[in-house]
Amino acid sequence: MAELTNYKDAASNRHLRFKLQSLSRRLDELEEATKNLQRAEDELLDLQDKVIQAEGSDSSTLAEIEVLRQRVLKIEGKDEEIKRAEDLCHTMKEKLEEEENLTRELKSEIERLQKRMVDLEKLEEALSRSKNECSQLCLSLNEERNLTKKISSELEMLRVKVKELESSEDRLDKTEQSLVSELEKLKSLTLSFVNERKYLNEKEKENEKIIKELTQKLEQNKKMNRDHMRNASTFLERNDLRIEDGISSTLSSKESKRKGSLDYLKQVENETRDKSENEKNRNQEDNKVKDLNQEIEKLKTQIKHFESLEEELKKMRAKNNDLQDNYLTELNRNRSLASQLEEIKLQVRKQKELGNGDIEGEDAFLLGRGRHERTKLKGHGSEASVSKHTSRELSPQHKRERLRNREFALSNEHYSLSSKQASSPVFTNKRAAKASNMGMGTDSGTQETKRTEDRFAPGSSHSEGKRGREQPSVLSRYPPAAQEHTKVWKGAPKPGTESGLKGKVEKTTRTFSDSTHVSVPNDIVGKGDKTSDLSSEAHCGKRGQVPGHASQGTQAVESSCSKAIGALSSSQKASSEGLSKGKKTANGLAADANFSNSKAPILSKYPYSSRSQENILQGFSLPNKEGVDQPVAVVMEDSSQHEALRCRVIKSSGREKPDSDDDLDIESFVTAKLVNTTITPEPEPKPQPNSREKVKSRGGTRTALFENDKNAAIENDSVKPTRPSSNAIEFPDANCAGVKNQRPFSPREALRSRAIIKPVIIDKDVKKIMGGSGTEVVLEKQKSTSKSVTSKVTSSITIYPSDSSGPRAVPSEAPRERHTSTSNIQVGPPELTAISNHVSSPLELSIHKHDITLQLTEAERVGDGSPKNRAEMVVSRSSILIKPSESVEKNSHVPPAETIRWKSHSASSDSRHITVRNAWKSKRDLKCSEDPPTGIGRNMEATNAYTQRPCTDFLELEQPRSQPSEQGARRVGNSGDAPELSPRRTQSSLTASEVLTRRDRMGGAITAASCNHSSSMEEGEDSTFVTSRRIHNPLEHSELPGKQGLPEPEPVWTEERLHPAKPYAEED
């Protein structure tokens, strides 16, 4: 080591020595440079001194020197001119000498050229002579060539003539042989044609017999089925008639063709016979050859004709077989329809027998079994008869009718369940599609005037229209028992092709989907899983459930979705019909949301049928403080091809008064058929509402129904209006009774009014939470663990702040618009509660509505006064996919992460893949930072533990939280081609102004604007639907009461995605 260190030291010392030497050298160089610089400076200074001295002394000598210089320059200039002249002289001499030499050379060249000229002249003379000789030789050659050509052409002509003669001899030999053979063939062909003619005549006779038998069978079938056709389905008669017409037309046309072909054959044979006789008389071979060729051609045409006749016979046999099959299927259909008619008649008789019974066990029956209000078929017979139904208060008879309706609904549901077990969903779908397609081309105009059509397939169950025709009693128009009655009218949708509908005056078919109203008991309402108990109790749900959903759980889920006030008022009267008679539905096919899955393929074959399927508008009407209800103006803007629908509803606000009764969860859900009416009614004064008529503030959101009966008030407690003119649909609380339909306007006003309504789907959840002093703690616990599934709604939503029409409304508030295009929003739900067991399952809700318009106007006023809010939602044809994310840690109160995924599945060229972030423009003044999320998860418990987990927190503390509404879980049936009924209730923006009178209660009213309709998607197609969503200005916020600060309502995020037509099978 020491050596290494020494070596390193030595090396470093050397290096330092070299550096010192180099630095010393540089210093020496620098010193020398400084010395040189100093010397130069000294010399410069000396020179400067000398110059200064010389300038002072030599000025005179310099002037003399300049004069001398000028003289010298002049002398030098003269010398230069002399030198130039001498140079010029020398050059001139040289040039002259050169020119003399050139002239001598030119002379010599001229002499040479002259000699050559003489030689060339001699050559030219010789060339001219030779040219003359050559020209003579060329002429002689050309003459010889022409002669040789003539001779060769003559030789070729002779050769061709010889060949022609030889070929003609050969041809004559061949033609003689061919004529002999063809004559033999003709003899054999004539024999075969005679045999075939006999065979064809026999076949014709057999076919005529078959045709006669078929016509006799069809006539017998018509006679057998006339009674059934009159009562149940005239479209079957029309199909039979069309079948008969098709048979007769095709058979007659083919008989005529056959007869014409046989006549032609006879003529051809006569001609051939005549020609054969003439041939015997003729002796010239050429004529015989021509005739034989013509006969051969004619016989070939005959052969082709016979082949075509054989093909036609084969086709006729196939068509006869098809007609026989169709005949058998029609017989089976007629039998099934007859059996169904008998069952319906028996059920109607049972209902009529039950009409005299008591109604005492109604409440227990409703709570135990669930409430099943069924939509009824209403015939469009005459406007006067319909107007009788329009305004009615409830009477004891109507109470009995409601009880009968419920029992009939239960019996129908048992029938549907048995039919579901009996038939597989694919089979029922195919059979229903086949049965429905037979009547697609039928005349919708005459059908509507004749009768109401019972609309149900074997797998589905629909309520009948006979009870819809029952005339209300006189007592029904008076208020004492008015709150008990719910009357839902459903116009029978008439199948028909679009072309069939174009030429016809079509009465408006209005279908209001099954409105199953379930009132929740108070003990259930207090719990966090109110709707789950309801869904488990009301096991029957909607009757139009998909056959594929064999499990009770999905039925309960659908029932919980459809449990809502669906009663569009029965006062959708003749005025709305009569004014809309000229109005054609955009699609020939309008179908219920309640059609069972087996009947949905009818809709799926018509891509635009969904526009007219359901118009759902749920309205809550609140009586004014002064007792006067403001007019409702609904203006529908009809865009081309029903692509976009905009509806503006202006409703007056009413003062709400809290009632002392317990709150109930009211899920209001209405589906309405396409109603073509424009309503411009005039206000009618309403009397002062009595104490029971006070509307709960929680259910106070009002939307205008698109009918003459536009105002509907959902009242949680039993409400007794004093006048039938109060336009409200009210839910009584005490007896869990249904909706009361009232006439807002006189029939004259209704006749004057018009409303053109395109498909509207509104699903409202009005959630009432029973309040007490002790519920606040429970509420916070539930808020921390609240879960709600984000509703993925494919829709176009336009939300405007409503026009301020109330006395305390802010008049100068201008509506702000905000367009947000969203699609496929998936929000992860918060953690599961430690108490309840949740099964995370994907849900798919498919919406096939082309246009959905929602309008919300809040009539409630807080103490300071707040503007009414109007939400307008246009939902285009779409599919909704709700997939709750996997369950996360229990007991964790962290708000859920929000994941937004945009999916755009489309085969169309203009499909767009859009990603839009959550950008909601909302007022922050109502935001309470200390408030936990107010969403209260409502656990849905189905019988098969198929539960839906709600998710509430959309934006954690950045945006006001929306109240979670009940999420409807929908399962897609196993059948691939069957569109599903997708009733569900989704989250919606909470109107905070409703909180005025609920300071002592903890829950917030929730209006869920959701799209609930049957998704009649394309059946076997992979066609996808492009859906767009526009979100206009979110609802404006009103001030909260002092004690309870409800967070500001947040519009529901909805999903827009291009969804393939086939539904997905969901996991349980």
From Swiss-Prot:
Q: Which residues carry this modification: Phosphoserine?
A: 256, 261, 395, 513, 571, 575, 612, 660, 691, 746, 906, 988
Region of interest (Required for interaction with FLNA), ranges: 834-884
Molecular function via GO: actin filament binding; microtubule binding
Instruction: Give the region (Disordered) as residue ranges.
Output: 251-292, 375-402, 432-558, 677-700, 782-829, 924-945, 959-995, 1033-1068
The molecule here is called Leucine zipper protein 1
* Composition-biased stretches (Low complexity): 785-796
Please give the coiled-coil regions recorded for this protein. 11-354
GO biological process terms held by the UniProt record: apical constriction; artery development; contractile ring contraction; negative regulation of cilium assembly; neural fold bending; regulation of protein complex stability; stress fiber assembly; ventricular septum development
Q: Where in the cell is it found?
A: Cytoplasm, Cytoskeleton, Microtubule organizing center, Centrosome; Cytoplasm, Cytoskeleton, Cilium basal body; Midbody; Chromosome, Centromere
Q: Which organism is it from?
A: Mus musculus
Principal place of residence = cytoplasm
